[in-house]
From Swiss-Prot:
Protein name: 22 kDa cell wall protein
This protein's UniProt keywords: Cell wall, Secreted
Taxonomic lineage from the root: Eukaryota, Viridiplantae, Streptophyta, Embryophyta, Tracheophyta
Subcellular localization: Secreted, Cell wall
Organism: Solanum lycopersicum
Domain of life according to the entry: Eukaryota
Amino acid sequence: KSTDFDYNNKKANYD
């Protein structure tokens, strides 16, 4: 299960 923290952390890597 992905958490909001994981999502935001991954998004930052792609931003």
